[in-house]
């Protein structure tokens, strides 16, 4: 089936037709050891090699007939008038936690002077070092301008942007424009707002919104999975809370996007398992990757909607049987990341062995470094497209994290 709407995603495994990426840019070079935790990184990727790896990832998708879109390009194309462009700059500045009126004025002048829209977008992503700004006359400084800190940035970079899965999530024909866990990442959702409001193809109300970035509760796209045209899966995780899920589901059901049930997975709250898709992804009609460490503590709730109310039931019993019953298959194979070896499972999950991108039933993009998990997947009859990711993985995300499907064929 060919999509008749700008967004069409009714599974995790239908043939991928169109996908959104972000090529890592100068924001990566604004990482520094003293502030890694603040920016949600554990290490600093080498940008030149990260870009080569990302370009190879994009080309691997194109080689499979997939149209690759870029976040920075769509955002630039959304600044369709001078008024919208200026509004974007002002909204960006209002969310940037800038210290000092004079500093904010200097940054606004810097951004307004950038004539090319894509260059402007990329600059907002990269952040602004204090050293880039002209010296502000003492007579123009307020108290916050005068009380200088040693922090080198007037505006923080957004180094997590190459994980396009999280700021918004495509669900059916709609989109969840998320309110993210950290202030560092929540600014990323501004690009999605302008794309789905003003872009010639994706804006103007063509795509229903099922969650709004101005909500006070948090949700991220790595916790939103489309298992089938009838069933969604959501994760209650380090980055997504139950209150957000309730709001999301009410909106999805009210907007009649076609879904009948949601499976909510509650699992350990820590950075190793920050999202559902870091421990659980669908790779075929009846196969999933899973990290064995979550299985013991996992709780699953079935959520349906009737008479304008959510109905929630805690599921008991075997996870594979539960998934099989909800997907209408005889049985489900849960493929453990790292197999039965505890050390391999921990290492390969840390390097996103469970975070796979399925581009067609049984055809999966993976990092080549997760050799044990990959061998198990191949032994199950899956076709693997292996990509290098030694620098990309330093951000703690795999092929699914780095991609947001815009169109899949129905299954």
Swiss-Prot record:
Cytoplasm as a keyword of this entry, yes or no, is: yes
InterPro entries under this entry?
Arg_deiminase
Pathway named in the protein's UniProt entry: Amino-acid degradation; L-arginine degradation via ADI pathway; carbamoyl phosphate from L-arginine: step 1/2
Q: Which Gene3D superfamilies match?
A: Arginine deiminase, L-arginine/glycine Amidinotransferase, Chain A
Among Pfam families, the record links this protein to: ADI
Record PTM text: Glycosylated.
Report the top EC class in one word. Answer: hydrolase
Q: Does the keyword Repeat apply?
A: no
Q: Which GO terms describe its molecular function?
A: arginine deiminase activity
Report which reactions are catalysed by this protein.
L-arginine + H2O = L-citrulline + NH4(+)
UniProt keywords (A-Z) are: Arginine metabolism, Cytoplasm, Glycoprotein, Hydrolase
Say where the protein is mainly found.
cytoplasm
> Gene Ontology terms, cellular component aspect?
cytoplasm
Q: Where in the cell is it found?
A: Cytoplasm
Q: Which GO annotations describe the biological process of this protein? A: arginine catabolic process to ornithine; arginine deiminase pathway
Q: Which residues form the active site?
A: 401 (amidino-cysteine intermediate)
Q: Which residues form the signal peptide?
A: none
Q: What is its EC number?
A: 3.5.3.6
Q: Give the domain of life.
A: Bacteria
Family note: Belongs to the arginine deiminase family.
The entry describes its oligomerization and partners as: Homotetramer. The recombinant protein is a homodimer.
What the protein does comes down to: Antitumor protein. Has a powerful and dose-dependent inhibitory effect on antigen, superantigen, or mitogen-stimulated human peripheral blood mononuclear cell (PBMC) proliferation. It may inhibit cell proliferation by arresting cell cycle and inducing apoptosis.
- What PANTHER family does this protein map onto? ARGININE DEIMINASE
Q: What is this protein called?
A: Arginine deiminase
Task: Identify the gene encoding this protein.
Answer: arcA
């Amino acid at each position: 089936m060919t999509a008749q709407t700008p967004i069409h995603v009714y599974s995790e495994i239908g043939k991928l037709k169109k996908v959104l990426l972000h090529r890592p840019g100068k924001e990566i070079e604004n990482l520094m050891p003293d502030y890694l935790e603040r920016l949600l990184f554990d290490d600093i990727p080498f940008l030149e090699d990260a870009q080569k790896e990302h370009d190879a990832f994009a080309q691997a998708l194109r080689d499979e007939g997939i149209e690759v879109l870029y976040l920075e390009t769509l955002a630039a194309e959304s600044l369709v008038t001078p008024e919208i462009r200026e509004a974007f700059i002002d909204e960006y500045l209002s969310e940037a936690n800038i210290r000092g009126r004079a500093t904010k004025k200097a940054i606004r002048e810097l951004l307004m002077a950038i004539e090319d829209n894509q260059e402007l977008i990329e600059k907002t992503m990269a952040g602004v070092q204090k050293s880039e700004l002209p010296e502000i006359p003492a007579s123009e400084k307020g108290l916050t301008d005068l009380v200088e800190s040693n922090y080198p940035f007037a505006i923080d970079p957004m180094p997590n942007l190459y994980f396009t899965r999280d700021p918004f999530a495509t669900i059916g024909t709609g989109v969840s424009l998320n309110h993210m866990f950290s202030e560092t990442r929540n600014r990323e959702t501004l690009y999605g707002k302008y794309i789905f409001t003003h872009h010639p193809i994706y804006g103007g109300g063509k795509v229903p919104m099922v969650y709004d970035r101005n909500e006070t509760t948090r949700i991220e796209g790595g916790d939103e999975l489309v298992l089938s045209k009838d069933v969604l899966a959501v994760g209650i995780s380090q980055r997504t809370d139950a209150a957000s899920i309730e709001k999301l589901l009410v909106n999805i059901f009210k907007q009649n996007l076609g879904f009948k049930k949601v499976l909510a997975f509650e699992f350990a709250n820590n950075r190793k398992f920050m999202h559902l898709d870091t421990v659980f992804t669908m790779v075929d009609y009846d196969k999933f990757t899973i990290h064995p460490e979550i299985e013991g503590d996992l709780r699953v709730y079935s959520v349906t909607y009737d008479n304008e109310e959510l109905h929630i039931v805690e599921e008991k019993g075997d996870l594979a049987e539960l998934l099989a019953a909800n997907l209408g298959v005889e049985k489900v194979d849960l493929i453990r990341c790292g197999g039965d070896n505890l050390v391999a499972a921990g290492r390969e999950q840390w390097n996103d062995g469970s975070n796979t991108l399925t581009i067609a039933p049984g055809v999966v993009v993976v990092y080549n470094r997760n050799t044990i998990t990959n061998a198990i997947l191949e032994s199950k009859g899956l076709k693997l497209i292996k990509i290098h990711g030694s620098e990309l993985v330093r951000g703690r995300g795999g092929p699914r994290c780095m991609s947001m499907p815009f169109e899949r064929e129905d299954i």
